[in-house]
A protein has these predicted regions:
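Bacterial N-terminal signal peptides that target proteins for export
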Residues: 1-11
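Short acidic, Pro/Gly- and aromatic-enriched capping/linker segments at domain boundaries
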Residues: 27-47
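A short tyrosine-centered beta-strand micro-motif
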Residues: 56-61
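Mature extracytoplasmic domains of secretory-pathway proteins
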Residues: 62-95
Length: 140
């Protein structure tokens, strides 16, 4: 094969390889990052975003998707069932809602999961959540 054709073939292969690498790099994979979680108990009905949470125990969990931050509220329900002479119970999680939030830096690592609320016209509204072990506060 003459040098000119060999050079042209080499350049063609190099161009094809470059296009393949560039196409692979352009396909960005979105990672769903799930942060720490904590458990809270609400003694009265509370609103967060446009979701109303009933009194009860919830697992709160932070997650990040495509750069947006969310807090998920999973209600813990005790379910009783009796298939034998012994009445057994187990805890079931029910997704009560997931609310978009923004994060603000905390003064340090959060020592205890805490929910901050305000009362608007007699209704309780959750304004922010701090989850044990994290170093940010989730603001609604």
């Amino acid at each position: 094969m003459p040098i000119g054709k060999l050079t042209l073939a080499t350049l063609g292969c190099l161009l094809l390889w470059t296009a393949t690498v560039a196409a692979g790099a352009a396909q960005k994979e979105d990672a769903l990052k799930v942060g720490k979680k904590g458990e809270i108990t609400l003694s009265q009905q509370a609103k967060v975003g446009n979701v109303v949470l009933q009194p009860g125990t919830y697992v709160v969990q932070h997650r990040v998707s495509r750069g947006d931050h969310f807090v998920r509220f999973l209600e813990l329900k005790e379910v009783k069932y009796s298939t034998t002479e012994i009445n057994d119970t187990y805890t079931e999680q029910d997704n009560a809602g997931e609310i978009k939030c923004r994060v603000e830096p905390a003064t340090g690592r959060i020592q205890q999961t805490t929910v901050y609320t305000v009362t608007d016209g007699g209704a309780v509204r959750i304004t922010k959540v701090a989850i044990k072990g994290e170093n940010v506060v989730h603001v609604f």
